[in-house]
Amino acid sequence: MSSIEELARANVRALTPYQSARRLGGNGDVWLNANEYPQAPEFQLTLQTLNRYPECQPVMVINRYAEYAGVTPEQVLVSRGADEGIELLIRAFCEPGKDAILFCPPTYGMYAVSAETFGVERRTAASKSDWQLDLDAIESQLDGTKVVYVCSPNNPTGNLIARDDLRQLLTLAQGKALVVIDEAYIEFCPQASTASWLAEFPHLVILRTLSKAFSLAGLRCGFTLANPEVIQLLLKVIAPYPLSTPVADIAAQALSHEGIAKMKANVAEVTTNRRWLSDILKNIPCIEEVFHSESNYLLVRFTASPSVFKTLWDQGIILRDQNKQPSLAGCLRITIGNRYECERVVAALQSLPGINA
């Protein structure tokens, strides 16, 4: 071990970084592995003040997002993607070596990575066979747990968590832990949002992003919705200038009435393509099951997923392998691209009838 490595914290030396889609690489021309929107939006910068430091919490961005989400500006914090929100909650509420977070695999990987980075215990309550919450398993681990992360729609399975279960979880956790509902994909099923519950549950926190339906993954802009007491605590640990001036400028434009209308058009296109792709995939021989999705991706179980993954990879079609996730053996996740990209996937898979593991 080098002397520099010896200086690092032991948990960081042992840490396996999150394997993001870009980190995994690939040389494709059909990128369906990161749940991005397939077409880049066009914006013109309007703020010519790059010689000045930006606002810590840009007022126009906060106000517009509050209006969009149906909350007050005091209930909104903006950050460098929702991933920073995940991290801020751990920094503000969890004592390393003492407290724990809890999440419900199979689910998004950054909850675990963020906790491990800060030396905070990671607890899991595996989802049931239908990928709904195992409330008994969660309740049995709440002592010493400060933050419970629930993703709905869940990534990578695509299902919504039952609203009655979410309410029951909030009741179980009252006075013990924050319940953080990750709504990164909520624009694809807005009726399922829990933002209206904030007045009822002071320990509810909601994560949002502009990366998915707003087609701004490269912007790195996310939001935390919570009661003002929580927001004020997070403001104590966030960086002094989390959003650059160009990011705030574009985010404000994306949250204008025109920008929100464009987002809704994106959602309509994705929903149409998802339905089309799902219906066709169900009749392809190398596919065992296409799971219902409320998001911009489909989870699919294949008869021989490693062969399928490599075959499509070699054709420049990059999917996301989910085999290492609990209960997802044989599964690949397919982002819903434009119609041409969906057709490329179908053509590649239809050439693989009767593939063997």
From Swiss-Prot:
CDD domains: AAT_like. The keyword tRNA-binding does not apply. The modification N6-(pyridoxal phosphate)lysine is found at K212. GO terms for biological process: L-histidine biosynthetic process. InterPro entries: Aminotrans_II_pyridoxalP_BS (IPR001917), Aminotransferase_I/II_large (IPR004839), HisP_aminotrans (IPR005861), PyrdxlP-dep_Trfase (IPR015424), PyrdxlP-dep_Trfase_major (IPR015421), PyrdxlP-dep_Trfase_small (IPR015422). Its EC number is 2.6.1.9. Its cofactor is pyridoxal 5'-phosphate. Homodimer. This is Histidinol-phosphate aminotransferase. It comes from Pectobacterium atrosepticum (strain SCRI 1043 / ATCC BAA-672) (Erwinia carotovora subsp. atroseptica).
